[in-house]
């Protein structure tokens, strides 16, 4: 259960870090946005290492579903744009896929 905490925290740090660069490069905001962006992306990487997993690739694949869901919350609450039904369908498919990766049977390796 603690993995979900790290996944969600990491997702919002990654999104915030990327959004800082988006503000600078796409919306013409100050280049100073790079500094909190770099800090946030560094924190994202550190947080993702807190996840208990035997293999990094499997942890990152499971994280992908959480990231996609967090992105829609960012869209709704930070950018104030209402997600479409197709956005939510896409999130549901991603979360189901991530759940298969996370909870699927494991052969002894």
Curated annotation (Swiss-Prot):
It is a multi-pass membrane protein. One of its GO terms (cellular component) is plasma membrane. The chain crosses the membrane at residues 5-25, 27-47, 59-79, 84-104. It is found in: Cell inner membrane. Pfam families: UPF0060. InterPro entries: UPF0060 (IPR003844). It comes from the Bacteria. Keywords: Cell inner membrane, Cell membrane, Membrane, Transmembrane, Transmembrane helix. Coiled coil: none annotated. Belongs to the UPF0060 family. This is UPF0060 membrane protein PA3275.
């Amino acid at each position: 259960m603690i993995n979900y905490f790290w996944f969600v925290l990491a997702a919002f740090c990654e999104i915030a870090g990327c959004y800082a660069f988006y503000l600078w490069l796409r919306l013409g905001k100050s280049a100073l946005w790079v500094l909190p962006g770099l800090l946030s992306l560094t924190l994202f990487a550190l947080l993702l290492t807190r996840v208990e997993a035997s293999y990094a690739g499997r942890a990152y694949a499971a994280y992908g579903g959480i990231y996609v869901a967090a992105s829609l919350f960012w869209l709704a609450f930070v950018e104030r744009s209402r997600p479409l039904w197709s956005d939510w369908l896409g999130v549901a498919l991603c979360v189901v896929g991530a759940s298969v990766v996370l909870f699927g049977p494991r052969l002894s390796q």
